[in-house]
């Protein structure tokens, strides 16, 4: 299944706020109206919607998300928590959380077009897994810096998650540590996502 490129507002009206996909928010109460129209939701649908929420927020294909679930399942600790950490430490998501891109698709474009360096080297793989002490910078070219400055100027000045530091005048972000689950940028019940996939096998 390919990455979603359809109408974004349609998705947030059904699934709730997806800040990685779009800065738009559903109107207050619209999700409640949708639920009342559809009646009582089945457990399968609840799990499916949580999975879709995760997939659309991080901009993943079905195959990519399944791969992350399998990696998380083999790691030590809670599968759901490890899954969120893997997704949050992707380079495209780190750029988004730093405010160097307004959405995750926007961050992915910056990476694909070779505007981003990690530890002084160009990285053009959006799924690159960032590690503690990684230094993320814009390429030292006017076009790259202008693009990121535009994002920094327009992004809401929200509190940065504790695992990141931004030096905006230097177009530089630092990864201090692996993200703590309470700083994940999406309201999600990750256990339902793990349950969804465990019931598919």
Swiss-Prot record:
Region (Disordered): 20-43
SUPFAM superfamilies noted in UniProt: Alpha-L RNA-binding motif
One example of a Gene Ontology biological process annotation: ribosomal small subunit biogenesis
Cross-referenced CDD domains: S4
Record domain S4 RNA-binding: where: 89-149
InterPro entries in UniProt: Ribosomal_uS4 (IPR022801), Ribosomal_uS4_bac-type (IPR005709), Ribosomal_uS4_CS (IPR018079), Ribosomal_uS4_N (IPR001912), S4_RNA-bd (IPR002942), S4_RNA-bd_sf (IPR036986)
A GO MF label: structural constituent of ribosome
Keyword tags: Chloroplast, Plastid, Ribonucleoprotein, Ribosomal protein, RNA-binding, rRNA-binding
Quaternary structure annotation from Swiss-Prot or TrEMBL: Part of the 30S ribosomal subunit. Contacts protein S5. The interaction surface between S4 and S5 is involved in control of translational fidelity.
NCBIfam families: PRK05327.1, rpsD_bact
Protein family (similarity comment): Belongs to the universal ribosomal protein uS4 family.
Function: One of the primary rRNA binding proteins, it binds directly to 16S rRNA where it nucleates assembly of the body of the 30S subunit. With S5 and S12 plays an important role in translational accuracy.
Entry protein name: Small ribosomal subunit protein uS4c
Organism: Buxus microphylla (Littleleaf boxwood)
Gene name tied to this protein: rps4
């Amino acid at each position: 299944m390919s990455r979603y490129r359809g109408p974004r507002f349609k998705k947030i009206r059904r699934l709730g706020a997806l800040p990685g996909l779009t800065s738009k928010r559903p109107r207050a109460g619209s999700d409640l109206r949708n639920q009342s129209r559809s009646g009582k939701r089945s457990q399968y649908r609840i799990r499916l919607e949580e999975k879709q929420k995760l997939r659309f927020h991080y901009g993943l294909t079905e195959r990519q998300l399944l791969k992350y679930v399998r990696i998380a399942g083999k790691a030590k600790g809670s599968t759901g928590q490890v899954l969120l950490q893997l997704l949050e430490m992707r380079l495209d998501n780190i750029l988004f959380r730093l405010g160097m891109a307004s959405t995750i698709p926007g961050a992915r474009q910056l990476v694909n077009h070779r505007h981003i360096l990690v530890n002084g080297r160009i990285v053009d793989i959006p799924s690159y897994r960032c590690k503690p002490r990684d230094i993320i910078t814009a390429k030292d070219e006017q076009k790259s810096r202008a693009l990121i400055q535009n994002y920094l100027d327009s992004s809401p000045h929200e509190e940065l998650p504790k695992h990141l530091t931004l030096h905006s005048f230097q177009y530089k972000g630092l990864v201090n540590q692996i993200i703590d689950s309470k700083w994940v940028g999406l309201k999600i019940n990750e256990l339902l996502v793990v349950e969804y996939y465990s019931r598919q096998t």
